[in-house]
From Swiss-Prot:
Main location: cytoplasm
Pathway the protein contributes to: Secondary metabolite biosynthesis
Quaternary structure, from the entry: Homooligomer.
Pfam family, one: Abhydrolase_1
Catalytic residue positions: S164 (nucleophile), D397, H425 (proton donor)
Catalytic activity: Release of N-terminal proline from a peptide
Function: Proline iminopeptidase; part of the gene cluster that mediates the biosynthesis of aculenes, a unique type of norsesquiterpenes that contain a nordaucane skeleton linked to an L-proline moiety and are of mixed biosynthetic origin. The pathway begins with the synthesis of dauca-4,7-diene by the terpene cyclase aneC using farnesyl pyrophosphate (FPP) as substrate.
Family matches, as Gene3D superfamilies: alpha/beta hydrolase
Protein name per its UniProtKB record: Proline iminopeptidase aneH
Gene name tied to this protein: aneH
GO CC annotations on file: cytoplasm
Subcellular location: Cytoplasm
Gene Ontology biological process: proteolysis
Amino acid sequence: MAVEQNIAPAKLIDRFSHDGPGKCRTSEWRFEVPLNHSKPDEGTVRLFARSIHCVLGVDDPELPWMLYLQGGPGLGCKTPLEYAWLPSILEKGYRVLFLDERGTGQSSPITAKTLAQQGDHKKQADLLKRFRADNIVRDCEAVRKHLYQDAPADQSKWSVMAASFGGFCAISYVSMFPNSLVEVFIGGGPCPMVNEPGQVIPRLFAVAARRNEVYYKKYPEDVGRVKRIIKYLKENKVALSKGTLTPERFQQLGVMLGLHGGIDYIHGVVQRTDNDLDMFKFLTAPTLDLIENSGMAHNVIYSLLQEPMYCQGKAGGWCADKCRKADPRFSLNERNAQIWFTGEAIFSDMFESYDELKDLKPVAELLARSSDWGQLYNEAQLARNEVPVYVATAVEDMYVSYDLGCHTASKVKNLQQVVNNTWYHDAVETKASEVMPALFALKEDRID
């Protein structure tokens, strides 16, 4: 994988700007870029972004740009002021661009219906292969070239702020277009540079196991509650507005276990669900809504590309299914001492219990069997990297393997980590007042 250069500037469709509270000015941008940057005649993707900066009396075009890469995969950006870390960035004098990565938010969003427009299942699967980190990065580069089209080459670099999967994209960016970047900040640990999810997901199951132990130690009364709920769901077909509440789907609430406050959130759902069964012998609408709106599996890109986001020349092969089957602690057997929740994982049965995913099961099968995934990282370039990379890393991270992240850190020159055993994966949001000063201390201070 060579360092890339030949990306054409994005085409600006329109831009609208508005003044808001705190002397902030936001702009909404729409761009057009090729679906395939190496073959521009194969179609286009529309990108949506919001930018924000502090107004200093005039609209100062000299403020340095910082790109934000959202976690996921498959999540669009929130509105800028919803990000807890943003004030510390604005205070440093950056102008921040929140880009909905291709297929998310308002950037040619991928849904079951929009995918169906592509034709048969193979065509849908082939399209989705264009929606991984490598092409997200090429889109970013096209947008950067538009923003800096009138700037001298030595003044056309920008910075990157990234979280979670956005950090995967950021490391790809460093390896593909190092001459475009000033610096990179990542919350959520360095990405695992692996070839297939089988190198990652068993490690994440191990963290999920530890989080289950913490959960039941804090809320031992939930052992019986969860068993009663699972028994009820086995014996009754419970309809949701967009699918069916199967025992496995309830078990997937565990995706929250690795977040700050996640254990308490799950306890609240369990307590409320059991209370419904105790009082009414059925689940009430507010409880069902609460369960249905938890997690991310209804997100099409997340469900279809969560395992392929690791793949480089190898197939994913439903790795999470294999891990769950191999570990009896994640069984739904009520004779187990405890019924454990699963963590961040995509299982094949999700394509039966989520309405948005039902028609996509054949697409998911094609992607799971596919091995023709391109390279996501230029490791030779990363080994000689000159772009400063600053990373906030949680030891007990249920979504990005700490061990594999540290291995990545050892392979990327000029990458510095601040490692903390009291942070979880979302600390850049929930503990921004700790994480952001720590990240900037890596940049502005020195250890020796």
